């Protein structure tokens, strides 16, 4: 976290205040609380919610443009924030802009290719007109590093106050369906990647599908699985071309975990409570299960 915040200071765009919302777990670095323009709020882990906690940060700020970053994202250069803001300022209908994610040096080979697939070199501004061509990827947005215009954020309803996952795509979907645009800014770059196991991929994709099932107003009728199939085919071809055939079984295994998790998440309402809780990554941070969250609404 200290490294990421330190790099945020090395920017070409003036920053007002940096709000840090920390879940109480272990020692919090004092040097962060002592940084200039940094305000730290501590919450209990059980209070954390992907949507509500980020909305809390939005309400803390009074800025017209608010940038969200996760603690494990590191700016690749000093231009990341300026590049995001520039796109928002150039078009009054663009409500969100998210950064390109580059693989870290310790990232495994398959994940490096996945980063390039999901975060290509060319920028793109997405609108409702792109749904036919891009399908669900039209709504893709990542709060690992993303900027939002406050006025459009509020008109689109803001982040869901109760969501298991995927708060960024849900909001992006609401924006696009309301006639606004979402920008992918390849010039705004952060270093961020994970070496997830197959089971971790299963849990993440289960929760992703649950979030989509919970928001039919955004995702119903939107083609989604074709993009995953395209990724698998292109990755396999890349591995063969690069003579990394020994990695193909790993790709097949991880892709299978993703697909099974996704399919089970789509039908989670039909599954027993114990199965739902086992499938959800919520157990990793002791949040309510997807079914509990649905009942609390």
Task: Describe the role of every protein-language-model region.
Residues 1-9, 285-297:
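Single conserved hydrophobic/aromatic residue that forms the stacking wall/gate
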Residues 146, 152-157, 162-188:
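A short, conserved alpha-helix in the catalytic core of glycosyltransferases
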Residues 79-111:
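Conserved donor NDP-sugar-binding/catalytic core segment of glycosyltransferases
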Residues 44-61:
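Glycine-rich, basic loop-to-helix element that forms the pyrophosphate-binding segment
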Residues 66:
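Short aromatic/hydrophobic "clamp" motif used to bind/position activated sugar donors
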Residues 10-43:
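Acidic donor-binding segment of Leloir-type glycosyltransferases
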Residues 128-148, 164:
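A recurrent flexible, glycine/aromatic-enriched loop bordering the glycosyltransferase active site
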Residues 182, 188-261:
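Active-site-adjacent helix/loop segment of glycosyltransferases
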